[in-house]
């Protein structure tokens, strides 16, 4: 019955079923969750994905190159260096290659840390003024576009509960390490207003989605088959009618 489907419809059906059957991509998580760190920090990357039973084999990639020798779900970078900067991805036996996570490593006294670069409307923003080797930092000021936004006598995170377009801009922090006044580099925080809606979990399990696609394909095939069957019989009827009319016309002429 599948041969009754037009090629374009068959390809569309196969594509929809394939997409429904594909598992979710793997996801790279950072611990601590900051995408900007200082040299000598410790960073753990964890691959969140689907694994077959008793097999947690994980493939890690740095700037598109496979990291040989790292097969565990967690990848620890101890005493991180500037050359460790770049894009990280992971893949499991049951999950496709993850989207990349951009990690920046800076050699400086201070770094303004953020968990991501682009925020959606209503999301919370966490900014952290981090010192090299966690040296004591006090009298910390967070600035947006050169203007002070928050001051802490003792170092603390700057938390924005709900992001809006007004929070777009260039941020940095400054504070005292000992008697020395230090400033971080600038971080550009951008805002995506209603560009993409929140992710919504599927209403039905995967097997029900696949069964639905197959059922719809079967119904479409039956409908298409009936269409061609009726059209063929209609053509035959028209031919017989024309032949009958022709013979009847000849009989009248005689």
Curated annotation (Swiss-Prot):
Give me the Extracellular side stretches, as residue ranges: 21-209
Chain ranges of the Ig-like C2-type domain: 23-104, 121-174
**From which domain of life does this come?**
Eukaryota
GO CC terms in record: cell surface; external side of plasma membrane
Q: How does it sit in the membrane?
A: Single-pass type I membrane protein
Disulfide-bonded cysteines: 47-90, 129-173
What other remark does the UniProt record contain for this protein? Exhibits stronger binding to afucosylated IgG than to the wild-type fucosylated form.
The task this protein performs is described as: Receptor for the invariable Fc fragment of immunoglobulin gamma (IgG). Binds with intermediate affinity to both IgG2a and IgG2b. Can bind to IgG2a and IgG2b monomers. Does not display binding to IgG1 or IgG3. Recognizes neutralizing virus-specific IgGs displayed on the cell surface of infected cells and triggers antibody-dependent cellular cytotoxicity (ADCC). Confers protection to lethal influenza virus infection.
Q: Output this protein's name.
A: Low affinity immunoglobulin gamma Fc region receptor III-A
């Amino acid at each position: 019955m599948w041969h009754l489907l037009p090629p374009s419809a068959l390809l569309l059906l196969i594509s929809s079923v394939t997409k429904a059957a594909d598992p979710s991509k793997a996801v790279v998580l950072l611990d601590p969750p900051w995408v900007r760190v200082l040299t000598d920090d410790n960073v753990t990357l964890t691959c969140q994905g689907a694994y077959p039973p008793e097999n947690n084999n994980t493939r890690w990639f740095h700037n598109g190159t496979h990291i040989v020798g790292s097969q565990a779900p967690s990848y620890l970078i101890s005493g991180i260096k500037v050359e460790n900067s770049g894009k990280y991805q992971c893949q499991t036996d049951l999950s496709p290659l993850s989207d990349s996570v951009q990690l920046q490593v800076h050699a400086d006294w201070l770094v303004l840390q953020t968990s991501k670069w682009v925020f959606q409307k209503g999301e919370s923003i966490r900014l952290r003024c981090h010192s090299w080797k966690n040296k004591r930092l006090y009298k910390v000021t967070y600035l947006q576009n050169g203007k002070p936004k928050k001051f802490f006598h003792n170092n603390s995170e700057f938390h924005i509960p709900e992001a809006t377009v007004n929070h777009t801009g260039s941020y940095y922090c400054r504070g005292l390490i000992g008697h020395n006044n230090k400033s971080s580099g600038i971080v550009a925080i951008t805002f995506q207003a209603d560009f993409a809606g929140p992710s919504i979990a599927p209403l039905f399990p995967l097997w029900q989605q696949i069964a639905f696609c197959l059922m719809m394909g079967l119904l479409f095939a039956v409908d298409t088959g009936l269409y061609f069957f009726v059209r063929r019989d209609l053509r035959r009827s028209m031919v017989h009618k024309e032949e009958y009319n022709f013979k009847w016309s000849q009989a009248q002429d005689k």
